Amino acid sequence: MHQVKSFLLLAIDGEKMVVVNVGSCIGCRRCERSCPINGITFNEFPIKCMHCDRNPCLYACPENAIERINNKVVVIKDKCVGCGLCALACPFGAIRIDGVAIKCNGCYKRDVEICKEVCPTGAINNLEEILNNKIQNTVNKFNKLYYLYANAK
């Protein structure tokens, strides 16, 4: 396993922002292996559907084989003819064609995406969770400083 360069890959997902912290990714590929539909590809870091608000893949599909379900962009395989227009429209390169379109469905039937559960470093996460953790850490630091200051008198 290798450590890759550190940067954030961000994409807006309706109300939330999905974050892949590439600097935290250790290249273990658990996210890729755990995906039940093989919707994550790995090329130095995980590439997965960001379930864009504007979802260009949905509008590019002439067969209406892509739908938004539970705020996730999902391929309906029975409708897909494998034309590849969705893959061309995807700004993240997260769709591949293997007879039909294959992409992350955001584990739309689950509360938490499997890739997020299995990631040992938390490299795949929601920005909201990351910010809440940072805020809590900052509050804890200020509380410690206040305690030290108050007890120094």
Curated annotation (Swiss-Prot):
Cofactor(s) named in the record: [4Fe-4S] cluster
Residue stretches making up the 4Fe-4S ferredoxin-type domain: 16-45, 40-71, 71-100, 95-129
Residues bound to [4Fe-4S] cluster 1: C25, C28, C31, C119
GO molecular function: 4 iron, 4 sulfur cluster binding; metal ion binding; oxidoreductase activity
Record-listed [4Fe-4S] cluster 4 binding positions: C61, C80, C83, C86
Record carries keyword Aminoacyl-tRNA synthetase: no
Keyword Ribonucleoprotein attributed: no
Domain of life: Archaea
Record keywords: 4Fe-4S, Electron transport, Iron, Iron-sulfur, Metal-binding, Repeat, Transport
Note describing how the cofactor binds: Binds 4 [4Fe-4S] clusters.
Binding site for [4Fe-4S] cluster 2: C35, C104, C107, C115
SUPFAM superfamilies listed in its UniProt record: 4Fe-4S ferredoxins
Matches recorded under Pfam families: Fer4, Fer4_11
Binding site for [4Fe-4S] cluster 3: C49, C52, C57, C90
Gene3D superfamilies with a match to the protein in the record: 3.30.70.20
Name of the protein in question: Uncharacterized protein MJ0264
